[in-house]
């Protein structure tokens, strides 16, 4: 708002005074961050963080898309952001358990970010701090998700949001501090078994075939839901 020299930025939920480097009202999620001022911007790191009204799932613009970056600077949702928001909303409708996973991530004290994959040949993945994961420490994550392709690196065809549900299970495990490295008798990580069970809930809704393998290894039938 440049009228009459006020020069405040409208962020939707709050207005920001650039001269002070502070919002003019308190953060509605202030109770989640007792160590910080309720008027601060981006966790006091405006270079590395973006304020998104306090939500704990952050959908970032496609890092490879110049148009996406331009739109985000002017306060618009980009094509990628709109698509991911729609996928998250549909996942909530698809299955109650998956809906609870998403809701708990949204309510988490950790920040869970969803952004576009950097290399489509490698497919979706979830980035975590491996040291924290090994120690069972709760943490935030970055999910790299491609909502535009139905073909996995393995060659399998499936609905894109099936892959998102898989990665969100990893985010949930990281958030809960349960992203440890236990394996099945034939060497499949239990975190992957949980993620496969989660995505199979969505496959039932999309009509995609039930997944029973991780890579070339069969998941023990007794562990499949």
Regions found by a protein language model. Name each.
Residues 8-10, 32, 38, 75, ...:
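Intrinsically disordered, low-complexity N-terminal regions enriched in serine/proline/glycine
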Residues 3-7, 12-14, 18-64:
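Short turn/helix-capping motifs enriched in Asx and small/polar residues
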Residues 1-10, 19, 132-139, 144:
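Short, ordered secondary-structure scaffold segments
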Residues 1, 26-27, 153, 187:
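Residue-level detector of alpha-helix boundaries and kinks
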Residues 68-74, 80-225:
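Catalytic toxin/effector domains delivered as secreted proteins or via bacterial secretion systems
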């Amino acid at each position: 708002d440049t009228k009459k020299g006020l020069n405040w930025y409208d962020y939707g939920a709050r207005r920001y005074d650039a001269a002070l480097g502070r919002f003019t009202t308190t953060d509605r999620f202030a109770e989640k961050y007792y160590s910080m001022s309720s008027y601060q911007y981006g966790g006091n790191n405006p270079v590395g963080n973006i304020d998104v009204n306090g939500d704990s799932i952050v959908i970032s613009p496609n890092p490879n898309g110049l148009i996406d970056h331009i739109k985000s600077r002017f306060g618009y949702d980009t094509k990628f952001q709109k698509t991911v928001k729609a996928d998250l909303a549909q996942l909530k409708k698809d299955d109650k358990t998956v809906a609870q996973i998403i809701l708990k991530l949204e309510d988490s004290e950790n920040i869970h970010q969803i952004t576009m994959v950097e290399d489509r040949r490698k497919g979706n993945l979830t980035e975590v701090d491996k040291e924290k994961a090994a120690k069972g420490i709760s943490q935030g994550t970055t999910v790299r998700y491609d909502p535009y392709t139905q073909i996995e690196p393995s060659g399998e065809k499936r609905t894109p949001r099936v892959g998102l549900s898989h990665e969100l299970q990893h985010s949930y495990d990281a958030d809960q501090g349960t992203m440890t490295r236990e394996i099945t008798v034939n060497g499949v990580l239990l975190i992957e078994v949980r993620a496969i069970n989660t995505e199979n809930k969505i496959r039932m809704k999309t009509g995609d075939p039930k997944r029973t393998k991780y890579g070339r290894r069969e998941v023990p039938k007794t562990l499949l839901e």
